[in-house]
Swiss-Prot record:
Its cofactor is heme. The keyword Heme applies. Belongs to the cytochrome P450 family. It comes from the Eukaryota. This is Cytochrome P450 4e3. The keyword Oxidoreductase applies. Its main location: endoplasmic reticulum. Keywords: Endoplasmic reticulum, Heme, Iron, Membrane, Metal-binding, Microsome, Monooxygenase, Oxidoreductase. Pfam families: p450. One of its GO terms (molecular function) is oxidoreductase activity, acting on paired donors, with incorporation or reduction of molecular oxygen. It is a peripheral membrane protein.
Amino acid sequence: MWLAVLALLVLPLITLVYFERKASQRRQLLKEFNGPTPVPILGNANRIGKNPAEILSTFFDWWYDYGKDNFLFWIGYSSHIVMTNPKQLEYILNSQQLIQKSTIYDLLHPWLGHGLLTSFGSKWHKHRKMITPSFHFNILQDFHEVMNENSAKFMTQLKKASAGDTIIDFQEHANYLTLDVICDTAMGVPINAMEQRDSSIVQAFRDMCYNINMRAFHPFKRSNRVFSLTPEFSAYQKTLKTLQDFTYDIIEKRVYALQNGGSKEDHDPSLPRKKMAFLDTLLSSTIDGRPLTRQEIYEEVSTFMFEGHDTTTSGVSFSVYLLSRHPDVQRKLYREQCEVMGHDMNRSVSFQEIAKMKYLDLFIKEAQRVYPSVPFIGRYCDKDYDINGSIVPKGTTLNLALILLGYNDRIFKDPHHFRPERFEEEKPAPFEYLPFSAGPRNCIGQKFALLELKTVISKVVRSFEVLPAVDELVSTDGRLNTYLGLAPDEKLKREAGRHKYDPILSAVLTLKSDNGLHLRLRERRS
């Protein structure tokens, strides 16, 4: 009896001593990195924040405190480095070995499997090479037709929602637009999310994205084993099955249609249409001389839908929100639209006209500087690495802070001023500005994303004057209304004057505003 009690007391102590010794060895290797002092067992978990919004704010504070450079923090005995030094970012992103994603991406495996986002090693290399032609110019033109069609529907939805000077949450509306675009381009199947927001598949997408964000920063639910014991697990399983059944069903129907000369396509409206979809390119692709398996096709289609939906929602939403706060910028954009589009401002914009919109391009670059759709990229060190002379031990997670780069005054003059012209006057050096990452694991769909962003914003600017939720929120001096990256005294001053419609930025896998992005729309009269 006493031996059992003694074992219960001693075993945790031995375990604690083991982890403390391992962490002490790692701290010695990492001593050149500045950061907040960890406490036993917790590390810095007691100071980092309780939710993604608080954690993002803490990261900005620590970054400022430690010279706007890399910094080290600990969650328990797990070491994490927030990387912001362009030279070291260049090494990491160009590395052919340091390509394993951080453990936060494990939350995506039940849904996405091991597609391009979550895989590594030889599978990732082969699939990357195979998928690259899917974003060829000719295929993008087919995708652009889908973007134009859905942008027109989106304007109709916005006119109804914003009638009578109503304040709307633009982030909420953009979510359904981008879901329609991505499902149509990925599989050739319209799901009509803008009109049927309560459909089972639309709700499944929303619920799955919420679940991933919720679990990412929960100390216990991040574990699959622990999560399986919670009340939310059964609903999660149902959501997962809905998404899997939907995608596999479309794949099987498309295979049947191809094998039967498309004869069934004319009789089943849920089948993919004749425009080239991402699914079609996968069905005609090979790896090592063989066709892709159904599971491989499922993984890549699901990955494309996840990456192309959440990130583009963020990009479109924050871009239009910035228009509401910066009317001078909006006027310049509208003038350019008039010059390029001519008298018929209601028609669809062509591929060639998009290319002529130079100020729109500058605007999107500046919007992505201050509100990057993907604020952080995670890498896991599967062995010790020498990163430009700094030894980073095995087991360390690297958080590549793309969002912090945009607020670094050593890279961008007056970073808290929103000024698209800066990208025309002085271009940042490589790896100082990374809205779509860089290197071998850069965003494979960046041309797709930029085309959708430009198409939607062009249509919004031509259709509406975008206004802030209340007039007092107009920026009269071009300053951003964020307090992130400011000196402590200025941050306190800005926080004290926070308006209820100022966004509360939250960063998990993509950037969002926890309280929405509120604005008004006034229809333009031609």
